[in-house]
Amino acid sequence: MASQIPYIDLHTHRNYPVSALEVRSIKNVALNHSELVTEVDCSVGLHPWYINGNTEHDLGLMANALERKQVLAIGECGIDKTIEIPLTDQQSIFDKQVCLAQKYQKPLIIHCVRAFEEIVSSLKRLDFKEPVIFHGYRKNWILGQQLIRKGYYLSIGQHCLNGSQDELLQHISLCHLL
């Protein structure tokens, strides 16, 4: 009998494993949101919602954390045009995280709200070569297709159950969906 591939929860905030359900979880750790790297597989990132005056310190914590084998990715990181933090600050911090991901050869888990052009432009300008996952993708199939053609992946959540992403779900290949 062939072994089954476990479900991978790419982005969780749970502090406990769900092994009984054959789920492999990657915990999200926001270093600037009072969390520490744990002994479970995780990603670390400076989420745009929590950017503050300690950014350089937080980037140092991130660089140290990236030395640990449990840290599998950088994220959530990205740009959110609906928050009050200046776009230039968000862009600068995002770019620094992209550079760290490149240096440590880690995938990026992207938080993107109304900033697809800025994020894709940064990834191209910085010649980023590692995997890129657009977390919580809620846009249409046309944009999704453009991102997939660039080699990026999309992750979706429960919002896809309301019918707003039926076209995306009908067309996207499972190899591009996380």
What name fits each language-model region?
Residues 1-178:
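Mid-domain alpha/beta scaffold segments of enzyme catalytic cores
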